[in-house]
């Protein structure tokens, strides 16, 4: 009743409320009111508020605001807003101090800070599954945005936590389409390596992959060579591998929330449709675009059908899906781990590098390396209080 009691005093003098803010943190209430009233009654108002505060057992402080100061405050409302999100298994005072030092050095002001995750357990046995996320709402124009982003990424790499910097626009608050890479993103393996081992050509496939990473051959050529080595593999092997796919931590929780919130979701993969469709049926993805292996008489032919889904094609598909769903490209999110994902990560409104190599992380701008894929929810702005683990069941 503190807010009610104090505003009732102001109401008796017909005061206008120009600004109001309140927070209750660990049983400590902080209430700020900016109000306008007739100068002739300001003394009476302050006296009554002091009496009411004493009666309620709270402290009260008054700060007169001149017309000039008020008008300057109004002018500042046009400044850009930014959202800085920090995320990890746990967060330390050192990490928060480092982040806020960078914010201050860029001449930005922190308007508000809120915790998005639930209350952290003290039990060390469950800490490995804990999540901690804090969101800063920041106002102003950075003196050097690129430097700020680089410092955040460097800090993230050395201090074992993830960080996101997003401009607080209309689109940040209404993302509608999320596109995922599959191998080493939705699942903790590379399916083609699993198939190669079962076909007895694991070392040969690894050698081709190494050549591609050295830049000796491009993705399309390496893909053709690796698929050719799978010739003769029984189709039943794919079913066996699909049923044992190691799904990445947080996928089920993330997909439950995204589906309940009405997001469209897609798998855009340089892997194979067989496994993408398996995940689609299990978790309810709306779209799957991947490479289709040719099968004849129950065995792989060593060939593929249709166009190769490479990095360029992933970006094209993201734009196509946004158009089909009538979604602005700024409302899209892309998540991936490899260089092949960079085109879609840089095309999307929000590109997130997931457990990726440094080059991919630096280019994407946003990254998650410390927790599972449900970390995506916090970068969108979801709070744990909106997320119910108890309803994480699928009936597709």
Question: Which stretches of residues belong to each language-model region?
Answer:
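Short glycine/serine/threonine-rich phosphate/pyrophosphate-binding segments
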Residues: 2, 95, 186-189, 341-344
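A conserved regulatory-domain signal marking ACT and ACT-like small-molecule sensing domains
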Residues: 1-175
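Short hydrophobic segments within beta-strands
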Residues: 87-89, 179-181, 268, 335
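Active-site neighborhood of HAD-like aspartate-dependent phosphohydrolases
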Residues: 170-220, 224
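Long, charge-rich alpha-helical interaction segments
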Residues: 211, 224-230, 242
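Conserved active-site and cofactor/substrate-binding residues in soluble primary-metabolism enzymes
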Residues: 40, 44, 94, 143, ...
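C-terminal cap/substrate-recognition subdomain and adjoining C-terminal extension
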Residues: 232-396
